[in-house]
Amino acid sequence: MPELLVFPAQTDLHEHPLYRAGHLILQDRASCLPAMLLDPRQAPMSWMPVPPQAIKTSHLAALLKNQGKIFAFDLDARRLASMATLLAWAGVSCCELAEEDFLAVSPLDPRYREVHYVLLDPSCSGSGMPSRQLEEPGAGTPSPVRLHALAGFQQRALCHALTFPSLQRLVYSMCSLCQEENEDMVQDALQQNPGAFRLAPALPARPHRGLSTFPGAEHCLRASPKTTLSGGFFVAVIERVEMPTSASQAKASAPERTPSPAPKRKKRAKSCSRCLHTALHIAEAPGSLLPGGKGRCLSSPWKTLGPHRRQQFAF
């Protein structure tokens, strides 16, 4: 990740002038993975981080070079106002904030029909966050009741995100170490959409993979304080399965039909063929990503956001 600077774990840069000026932002290295794995540099399309988080949204905007469109939703007006302030401080101008419930957003809404990428980071137990475990003893092992409630919301959010018609790639991320919130959620979503989506290998060179709970779980990625010297994190990259890219391919896979001799019927069939060709042509969005280093890191994504920003600094 060339936009990141890595520092020793105990480095305190909160008072550094570059940080205070908005040129740099403190971020756990593992939390940088979702935006990178979404691979937004492929094309300036429409993006949707759910729920909106200033750090991850800013990272997306930087990778997009402030192009395209990012939609972010939150029902809490105060959180949205705070996020708007932070995004403005970072120089982000391609994000549109909406005080809406993501689960109530219609995938057929003209505003969101062309959303191609979704970064889904719903509420979770936070069992992978070392700071929470220090502040709340026992936070690393949430109760079954709380896990069940969280998993229900995560399942609804993930399944809803997969219904957007133009979706090409979704990154599901959790700052949790619990299988119920991680591998189980991904397996359930794939089972509910058989043949429509698949897991893409996330940084296959990295040794720390998803738990072997279902075939393909090794494509998921895990991080933890013990294994990667970072916060605990889970990431899965879900891609839409490619459909035929031409009307002839689609016709070959469809049941054979006897054409009608009526001229009008022939004309309608030709028109439908053109529509089918357009609907089935889906652009690929392959990713080529490299693992980061060890330790705490400082993200400097805003160097690409405007002429008033500075280049990346090393210490």
From Swiss-Prot:
Record InterPro entries: MeTrfase_RsmB-F_NOP2_cat, MeTrfase_RsmB-F_NOP2_dom, NSUN5_7_fdxn-like, RCMT, SAM-dependent_MTases_sf
Amino acids binding S-adenosyl-L-methionine: 50-56, 74, 79, 121
Keywords: Methyltransferase, RNA-binding, S-adenosyl-L-methionine, Transferase, Williams-Beuren syndrome
Job description of the protein: May have S-adenosyl-L-methionine-dependent methyl-transferase activity.
Name this polypeptide is given: Putative methyltransferase NSUN5C
Matches recorded under PROSITE patterns: SAM_MT_RSMB_NOP (PS51686)
BP-aspect Gene Ontology terms: RNA methylation; RNA processing
Organism of derivation: Homo sapiens
EC number: 2.1.1.-
Region of interest called Disordered, as start-end residue ranges on this chain: 245-269
Similarity-based family: Belongs to the class I-like SAM-binding methyltransferase superfamily. RsmB/NOP family.
Gene Ontology molecular function: RNA binding; RNA methyltransferase activity; S-adenosylmethionine-dependent methyltransferase activity
Top-level EC class as recorded in UniProt: transferase
Source organism, top-level taxon: Eukaryota
Active site, per annotation: 175 (nucleophile)
Tissues where the protein occurs: Ubiquitous.
Transmembrane intervals: none
Disease the record associates with this protein: NSUN5C is located in the Williams-Beuren syndrome (WBS) critical region. WBS results from a hemizygous deletion of several genes on chromosome 7q11.23, thought to arise as a consequence of unequal crossing over between highly homologous low-copy repeat sequences flanking the deleted region.
